[in-house]
UniProtKB/Swiss-Prot annotation:
Pfam families: mTERF. GO terms for cellular component: mitochondrion. It comes from Gallus gallus (Chicken). Its main location: mitochondrion. It is found in: Mitochondrion. Belongs to the mTERF family. GO terms for molecular function: transcription cis-regulatory region binding. Contains about seven structural repeats of about 35 residues, where each repeat contains three helices. The repeats form a superhelical structure with a solenoid shape. This is Transcription termination factor 3, mitochondrial. Binds promoter DNA and regulates initiation of transcription. Required for normal mitochondrial transcription, and for normal assembly of mitochondrial respiratory complexes. Required for normal mitochondrial function. PANTHER family: CGI-12 PROTEIN-RELATED (PTHR13068), TRANSCRIPTION TERMINATION FACTOR 3, MITOCHONDRIAL (PTHR13068:SF194). Residues 1-64 form a transit peptide.
C-alpha cells in the first residue's frame, strides 16, 4: 500500500478511536432506528473540533436492508438512565496525534503501487551517462542554459581540460552569480562577460575571497582600477594566479630586464600575458637576443620594453626575421633597437617590399643618405600608401611585380 493510503487509513483509525467511548446502548438504539444529527450527538461532551468528522457507522455495524430496529428495553427507568450515561475515554491530544503521524514509515523504492498511482508519476529525463559535448546537457542544466544566454560559447569551453565537468558541478545562483558580480566590479562589461568566461571558465570555480585578495594586491602595487580592468581583459587567466606568484613574476621582469618599478608596471599593463605565460620561453628569447643576435644588455632592455611581444615570440621566427633584416638587408643593431616593432611584422611582407624597392632602385635604409626609408615606413604603411609615397609607383606595378617572384 502506498504511503498516502496508509496515512488515510491511520487518520480514520485515530478519528474512530477518539469517539469510540461515546457510544452507549441508548445511542446504539438510536443509530439502529435512525441517525441523530452529529452536532446534537456531540453537544454534551465538548469535543475538540478534529473529532467532529466521525461517521455514525463507527457507532454501530450497519444492518441489512429491511432489518427491524432493536426492541425497546424493559428495564426500569433508573437502570436505563444509568446505562444511558456515556462512557468516555481519555482525550487524544494533538501531540499524540502528531506522534502517530510521525510513526508512518517512509516510502520505499521497492514498495508496490497501483497502476493508477504509477501513471501519475512523472520522471525527469535521464542525463546522458557520458558525452563528448556539453550540448547534450544544456536542456538538463539550468547553469549551462543561463551561461549560454550570457554569451558563453560552450563549444569552446568543452575544449579546455576539465572545464565542462566543472560547469556541470556548479549551481548558478549559489556559485556563479557572486563571481559575475565580482567581475563587474573589476570593470568587465556585461557584453564582455560571455567572451571572458569562454576564455577562462575556471574562474567560476575560484573562491571569491581569493579573487578579491589578488585584486587588492594589484592595487597595493599602485595599479589603478582602469589598468586592472585592462590587464584582466587582455589576460583572462591573470586572476587565477596567487599573490605570491604574481609578486614573483613582477620581480622576475624587473630584475631580468633591469627596469625600474614604473617601467615594469608599464610593461605588464601593455602586455599582461607576461604575468600568466611560462617563463622558460622568455629566458630563452633573452638569451637568443644577447648571444645569437649580438645585442647588448641595454639594447635588449629597450627592445623588450618597446615590443614586449618579442619575449614570447617563436625563436625560429625571430631568427629568420633577424637574419633577413641584418644579414641580407644590412640593417645594423642600433636601427633594429630603435624600431624593434619590425620583428612583429610578417617576414613575407618584408621580403616583398624590400625586393620591390631593389627592383626600383630605391632600397636605401641609411639615415645619413638621401631617399632614406625607415623600417617603420617599410612595414607599417598600407600597400597603396607604400606604393605611392615610398616606392613612387602604382599599385598595379607592385601587383605585377609580385607575380614575377
Amino acid at each position: 500500500m502506498a504511503v498516502w493510503a496508509r496515512q488515510v487509513a491511520r487518520c480514520g483509525w485515530l478519528r474512530a478511536a477518539g469517539l469510540l467511548g461515546l457510544r452507549s446502548r441508548s445511542g446504539a438504539a438510536r443509530a439502529c432506528c435512525g441517525a441523530a444529527p452529529l452536532p446534537a450527538l456531540l453537544s454534551g461532551h465538548r469535543l475538540p473540533p478534529w473529532r467532529l468528522r466521525v461517521s455514525v457507522d463507527y457507532a454501530q455495524p450497519s444492518r441489512a436492508k429491511g432489518e427491524a430496529c432493536a426492541p425497546r428495553s424493559s428495564l426500569p427507568v433508573a437502570v436505563k438512565q444509568e446505562q444511558a450515561a456515556p462512557e468516555t475515554v481519555s482525550d487524544l491530544s494533538a501531540a499524540k496525534l502528531c506522534e502517530d503521524w510521525d510513526d508512518v514509515p517512509p516510502s520505499s523504492a521497492l514498495e508496490e503501487i497501483s497502476e493508477e498511482e504509477a501513471v501519475k508519476i512523472i520522471a525527469d529525463p535521464l542525463l546522458p551517462p557520458q558525452s563528448s559535448t556539453l550540448r547534450d546537457y544544456v536542456d538538463h542544466s539550468e547553469t549551462l542554459t543561463k551561461l549560454v544566454h550570457l554569451g558563453v560559447d560552450l563549444s569552446q569551453v568543452e575544449k579546455r581540460q576539465k572545464a565542462g565537468q566543472l560547469l556541470l558541478t556548479l549551481d548558478f545562483e549559489k556559485d556563479i552569480t557572486k563571481i559575475l558580480l565580482f567581475l563587474k566590479d573589476v570593470g568587465i562589461e556585461d557584453n564582455q562577460l560571455g567572451p571572458f568566461l569562454t576564455k577562462n571558465p575556471y574562474i567560476l570555480g575560484e573562491e571569491l575571497e581569493a579573487l578579491e585578495t589578488r585584486v587588492a594586491y594589484l592595487k597595493s602595487k599602485k595599479f589603478g582600477n582602469a589598468e586592472i580592468t585592462q590587464m584582466v581583459s587582455r589576460a583572462p587567466y591573470l586572476l587565477l594566479f596567487s599573490v605570491e606568484r604574481l609578486d614573483n613574476r613582477l620581480g622576475f621582469f624587473k630584475n631580468e630586464l633591469g627596469l625600474s618599478v614604473k617601467k615594469t608596471k608599464d610593461l605588464v599593463i601593455r602586455f599582461p600575458r607576461l604575468l600568466t605565460g611560462k617563463l622558460e620561453p622568455v629566458k630563452e628569447n633573452l638569451q637568443v637576443c644577447q648571444v645569437e643576435f649580438g645585442f647588448e644588455r641595454n639594447e635588449v632592455q629597450q627592445i623588450a620594453f618597446k615590443t614586449p611581444k618579442i619575449l614570447t615570440a617563436s625563436k625560429k621566427r625571430l631568427r629568420q626575421t633577424f637574419d633577413y633584416l641584418h644579414n641580407i638587408m644590412g640593417i645594423p643593431h642600433n636601427m633594429l633597437t630603435r624600431f624593434p616593432q619590425v620583428f612583429n611584422s610578417k617576414l613575407l611582407r618584408i621580403k616583398e617590399r624590400h625586393m620591390f624597392l631593389i627592383f626600383l632602385g630605391r632600397a636605401q635604409y641609411d639615415p645619413t643618405k638621401p631617399s632614406y626609408i625607415s623600417l617603420d615606413q617599410l612595414v607599417s604603411l598600407p600597400d597603396e600608401v607604400f606604393c605611392t609615397e615610398i616606392a613612387k609607383a602604382s599599385m598595379q606595378d607592385f601587383e605585377k611585380f609580385l607575380k614575377t617572384i
